[in-house]
Amino acid sequence: LVRSPGVYFSEDHDTGSGRPLASAKLIPYRGAWMEFETSNRDVIYVKLDRKRKTPVSTLLRTLGYETNEEILELFEDVDNNPDHKFIETTIAKDSGVTTKDEALIEFYRRLRPGEPPNAENAQALIESLFFDSRRYDLGKVGRYKLESNLKGLKFQEIDGSTRILSKEDIVSLLRRLIQINNSEKRANDIDHLGNRRVRAVGELIQNQVRVGFLRMERVIRERMTIQVDPETTTPAALINVRPVVAAVREFFGGSQL
């Protein structure tokens, strides 16, 4: 019994004022998690792949919303509480990052600490984590739950069969988060049985076979760099099925089933 993919909103209450502080988890069927939280100082943070948190305005800049005006315009109809301006406060917290390249480098530092950052590598990393169907998959259930939770918030409709994230998904999620912070919407119960599902044996085997194919692909790519003569190289010299066989044996020999 595992948690279904999708977006889940929850809320804590500030101990001083008692007002709600919303958070959200975007859980894919396969891939990196994206988590959002609101501080008691009205700053909204995001954590990618469970790494260090960053003001969400940095994430929005990596998606192409580069100026403060563009970011504020996305939320002007929901971030309208005069006492709590979440996006303005978040931008002020993130005053050191003002361009897309700076935002990309900031994320790269947090996701790959110790490696020399540059904007090109950072862009490739962000795209591979959340916008590449080979590494990220919401699943049909995840896409359905995402759409049902964010109904009426999107300024651009997304094809229901799309199983990777879009920047519209992220903006709409943040719009809902602000509504919960303003007590205009309610959070959902992440632990409700309706948000759980049974992971069948076939699905477990499928995931393990996928791991085997990825290992086999890596071996093939390595051999292709070594084999210098494409005229004499044959498929049999490049392809080795042992990683797939080993992955399946590993499942049947070591799985809790």
What spans do the regions from the language model cover?
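N-terminal non-catalytic structural scaffold regions of very large proteins
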Residues: L1-Q256
